[in-house]
Amino acid sequence: MATSASSHLSKAIKHMYMKLPQGEKVQAMYIWIDGTGEHLRCKTRTLDHEPKSLEDLPEWNFDGSSTFQAEGSNSDMYLRPAAMFRDPFRKDPNKLVLCEVFKYNRQSADTNLRHTCRRIMDMVSNQHPWFGMEQEYTLLGTDGHPFGWPSNCFPGPQGPYYCGVGADKAYGRDIVEAHYRACLYAGVKIGGTNAEVMPAQWEFQVGPCEGIEMGDHLWIARFILHRVCEDFGVIVSFDPKPIPGNWNGAGCHTNFSTKNMREDGGLKHIEEAIEKLSKRHQYHIRAYDPKGGLDNARRLTGFHETSSIHEFSAGVANRGASIRIPRNVGHEKKGYFEDRGPSANCDPYAVTEALVRTCLLNETGDEPFEYKN
């Protein structure tokens, strides 16, 4: 089980320098989604004072030819601050800054899905769409082997690991706890965490978040997890099926509701939304992973608590369905529903936008509707 060389560097020595005063200066780490649509990049700049709002953060640029976002002959891309969080690594007053990416001509970059998602969310703000996303992930050594697994064989079969306790059942809990606390410090709306069905697989939940906030908070939570794993010398994988065979995949189940769904009699509105989703299954499958459904095809097999990628289904408390209505929602006749389609490496902006387009804007067909400004 290989760990990175950086994890063997003395953290005590680093801590000695991190305690040095920084005067009035502030370090702002700018974070963005690269051309893959699923990986993150970051770089840091010095500010003269602590920013209190996005307006205090300057626009910046980067070399898009090194992030799969531009050609070398015209490589400058723009970073426009979109959301700001406390920095749990450098501590206050330093900041994490999630950015949107724009091309040389100020047009939105191809993987800047936040840009259109924000417009769609603004159109339905009076319906107060809430989201909660359940991010599953797998811990790996730098050699790609699952963290804690025997080097030349497999661990025992699935069964004792989900919410498991003990060194033989929970692999990597220190990472999970560090990530949880770092998210709380940063201001991420992290809701909880648990060990998952496959050993070395974990989940954290973010939400409820309203509108565009869902994507902002999940992307920053992912960034923080990558950085925590970097410190521990391991890798976090959001691959939806990291280990072939009789092992669970990794999803990002998405809980969705509107004000009407959360009020008395809301089950009627939930059922109406599910009916709309049933008629637009393939559109959602394409939106639910960065490769247009190819990644999810390895996960949505109809086995290991998944539905078939080829068929739409829904049911109360059914984890083998495309859409699950929680049992308490069925009992209380109001609440939310869970879309079990999104893959672990999905873009939350794409997922939440697709749900709003279909369920609230009543779009149909295989392509998103183009709205005029």
From Swiss-Prot:
GO terms for biological process: glutamine biosynthetic process. The keyword Manganese applies. It catalyses: L-glutamate + NH4(+) + ATP = L-glutamine + ADP + phosphate + H(+); L-glutamate + H(+) = 4-aminobutanoate + CO2. GO terms for molecular function: ATP binding; glutamate decarboxylase activity; glutamine synthetase activity; metal ion binding. ATP binds at E134, E203, F204, Q205, V206, G207, P208, N255, F256, S257, R319, R324. Mn(2+) 1 binds at E134, H253, E338. Signal peptide: none annotated. Induction: In the retina, down-regulated upon application of glutamate concentrations of 15 umol/eye or higher. Its EC number is 6.3.1.2, 4.1.1.15. Expressed in retina, brain and liver. Little or no detectable expression in breast muscle, pancreas and spleen. Residues 113-373 form the GS catalytic domain. It comes from the Eukaryota. This is Glutamine synthetase. It comes from Gallus gallus (Chicken). The lineage of its organism: Eukaryota, Metazoa, Chordata, Craniata, Vertebrata.
